[in-house]
Design a protein with these regions (language model features):
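Short, glycine-/small- and polar/acidic-enriched structural segments
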Residues: 1-144, 149-153, 167, 171-177, ...
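Small-molecule pocket liners
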Residues: 16, 92-98, 189-190, 204-208, ...
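Stable alpha-helical elements in mature extracytoplasmic
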Residues: 14, 23, 48, 52, ...
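Conserved C-terminal helix/tail region of periplasmic/extracytoplasmic solute-binding proteins
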Residues: 285-312
Length: 312
């Protein structure tokens, strides 16, 4: 099995378990416990599902962490021997919030050409896919792309900065914690909807995925990675303040520790290996012609090593 593993994550507390894994060297610990004491672990950070998918396809990393939408697109693209990408576990259920600083925008129906919506990657990011699902819910499947022309690709921290500045063309932001929390403290910014409204309940936002070749050739390494993720989840649950301290130490973000603890402890946020509501996203992407292959259940998107989880 390999003696080095490279992982990429993105921005926000929906990646918190991975930040904890890096800081606490949990993969190294779990690998050592499995007879691999010299495991080298390298972490990178990118923005948007497209870029983490490209990193995996280019063999620049062994594991990518990204939204359920980008996973499904990659699963579809790499099926039948072209990499056969699947998820090894879920990372987080975190609501994404669509915010606006245009007082005229109370619901999706109020968006017009006067609005520009920042999100991590147009068309492909989980925010973009959820916006399409919301549009399809409101206007029918044929109109799922109705709001796409208003969207702009932008890193969450930059989108938040634009919203809070009150300047520039960006007057809406589809984001997640901690950025939505920070923005909503500004009285000029309000919530239009969140992803749990669209999915009808909690939904996994982030999953961890790799190729079949890597997964099958390195079962002990994969076991160590998933065990490390599980350990991180336990630490977050047992000690949210410690998790918040780790997040701030690694990311150097400017959120207050108390705000972070409140977010991490929110009943709407869950860090666990079992996925929630991933299958409806696969159905939507297939129905709207974005992916060719039809998943028959959430298990199609995950390696058999994850099938014992009580997922959806």
């Amino acid at each position: 099995e390999v003696d080095e593993v490279r992982l990429v994550r993105q921005f926000g507390i929906h990646y918190l378990p991975l930040v904890v894994m890096e800081h606490e060297k949990l993969i190294e610990k779990e690998a050592a416990a499995r007879g691999m004491p010299n495991m080298k672990v390298t972490w990178a950070q990118l923005s948007g599902g497209a870029s983490v998918n490209d990193a995996l396809l280019a063999d620049a990393v062994e594991y990518s962490a990204g939204g359920v939408g980008p996973l499904i697109v990659l699963w579809d693209k790499t099926k039948d021997g072209k990499g056969d990408v699947h998820a090894v576990a879920a990372v987080s259920d975190v609501p994404m919030t669509l915010l606006s600083r245009n007082p005229a925008v109370k619901s999706l129906a109020d968006f017009s050409d006067k609005d520009k919506i920042a999100l991590p990657a147009v068309k492909t990011s989980m925010q973009a896919v959820t916006l399409q699902m919301a549009a399809a819910k409101m206007w029918g499947d044929d109109a799922f792309e109705k709001l796409d022309k208003l969207t702009v690709s932008m890193r969450h921290p930059d989108g938040a900065a634009q919203m809070l500045s009150g300047q520039g063309e960006i007057n809406a932001h589809f984001t997640a914690a901690p950025y939505d929390f920070m923005e909503l403290k500004n009285p000029g910014i309000h919530r239009v909807l969140d992803s749990y409204d669209v999915y009808g309940g909690p939904a996994t936002l982030i999953v961890l995925y790799t190729t079949k070749k890597f997964h099958d050739e390195n079962p002990k390494v994969n076991e160590a990675v998933v065990a490390a993720l599980n350990e991180a989840d336990k630490l977050i649950k047992a000690d949210p303040r410690r998790a918040a301290e780790i997040y701030l130490a690694v990311t150097k973000e400017k959120t207050s520790i108390d705000d972070l603890v409140a977010m991490i402890s929110s009943p709407k946020i869950a860090y666990r290996l079992a996925p929630s509501a991933t299958f409806p996203v696969a159905q939507f992407l297939h129905r709207t012609g974005r992916v060719k292959h039809q998943a028959t259940s959430w298990k199609d998107l995950f390696f058999p090593s994850a099938h014992h989880l009580s997922g959806s």
